[in-house]
């Protein structure tokens, strides 16, 4: 298997895994604690030696690979809403990587959260609120806001809002890594078969 394509597909799976949780939260108001932790932990790995250092929860990653197959394959399971969120994340990622001040602020704020984890778990409400505020303060102001669809009763709850923003930050982290590994939007069209084949092979690892 092509190592670069494998790592790039891993990062793309990470984006979709976080986005799918956003969708589920917006509709149902609840999240799987292990999946949430897996996505949020990726934010904190800022100097990885490999993509595998970022995505250490294999069960969560496998869900991400299945989402890659659904979104890029010819199946009827392609989700237009997931695609819309993906387009929004990739657009914001481009703006972030062009903003030196934004990247510097992001690094500092993530370091603050890392220090907080000496006392709290990654899924603690205070930690999630801090991750959410990073997204609101730095990412959300870069461009058009991503409009989240869902159950209004769920979306009104502060903890749901915080989890959604924290997961969007996780999606951004994976998008940054995907781009660093050479990912381009045109690959999602012209290299679709190679990405699908890599995701299928990765599911067997």
Swiss-Prot record:
Please tell me whether the keyword Cell inner membrane is annotated for this protein: yes
What GO CC annotations are associated with the protein? cytoplasm; plasma membrane
What membrane topology term does the record carry?
A: Peripheral membrane protein
Q: Which Pfam families match?
A: DUF489
Q: Where in the cell is it found?
A: Cytoplasm; Cell inner membrane
User: Where this protein primarily resides, as one coarse class?
Assistant: cytoplasm
Keyword check for Transcription, yes or no: no
Gene3D superfamilies in the record, alphabetically?
Answer: HflD-like
Keyword entries, A-Z:
Cell inner membrane, Cell membrane, Cytoplasm, Membrane
Regarding protein family, the annotation reads:
Belongs to the HflD family.
State the NCBIfam families in the record: PRK00218.1-2, PRK00218.1-4
Q: What name does the UniProt record give this protein?
A: High frequency lysogenization protein HflD homolog
Native organism is: Shewanella sp. (strain MR-7)
Report the gene name: hflD
